[in-house]
Amino acid sequence: MSSINIALDGPAAAGKSTIAKRVASRLSMIYVDTGAMYRAITYKYLQNGKPENFDYLINNTKLELTYDEVKGQRILLDNQDVTDYLRENDVTHHVSYVASKEPVRSFAVKIQKELAAKKGIVMDGRDIGTVVLPDAELKVYMIASVAERAERRQKENEQRGIESNLEQLKEEIEARDHYDMNREISPLQKAEDAITLDTTGKSIEEVTNEILSLL
């Protein structure tokens, strides 16, 4: 499948990254986690004391994606591997705000388009099918109930040793949905030619097989 690109979009904790990794593995394609790119920039934003001059921040940022056979995609921010810090609560709380800024979006989208130019890419995010890969051969818009998404996020946090409250996670996910869908730049929306896939109550394998059956 080195001659096609696959775009997976959807709201927070809909299972995009997990499924994208599995689909890429099954098809021997390269998985690109665009959310990690925005999280890396958010991490730098926080480390620099939340500066509001995003043009300056981006102009002084170097971002690279590398691939490790064991650990998978790694994010190098200014030549340092920051991958293990990107799921911290503080980063999660600020990433929507940072990702909504035009300099940040333009910077990340440029890198994403360059990565996808050679084809053979599975990419997940919120504007992949609409902005980054409008010509992707397969576009899937993944959804799931807020309750299930909160439970998934709590399990992810537990695996990473991060404490979280389920009800608070539900509120945060609902707030994130509203923010992502209503921001001016690259709002979360389904591409006209995308196929909607509800992952509520489905296993990783079931969802993976459904997507593979669309090819």
Swiss-Prot record:
Molecular-function GO terms, alphabetical: ATP binding; CMP kinase activity; dCMP kinase activity
Protein location: Cytoplasm
Catalytic activity entry: CMP + ATP = CDP + ADP; dCMP + ATP = dCDP + ADP
GO terms under cellular component: cytosol
GO biological process, one term: nucleobase-containing small molecule interconversion
Pfam families, alphabetized: Cytidylate_kin
Positions bound to ATP: 10-18
Keyword entries, A-Z: ATP-binding, Cytoplasm, Kinase, Nucleotide-binding, Transferase
Protein EC: 2.7.4.25
NCBIfam families assigned: cmk
HAMAP family linked to this entry: Cytidyl_kinase_type1
Family membership: Belongs to the cytidylate kinase family. Type 1 subfamily.
Protein name per Swiss-Prot or TrEMBL: Cytidylate kinase
Organism: Staphylococcus epidermidis (strain ATCC 35984 / DSM 28319 / BCRC 17069 / CCUG 31568 / BM 3577 / RP62A)
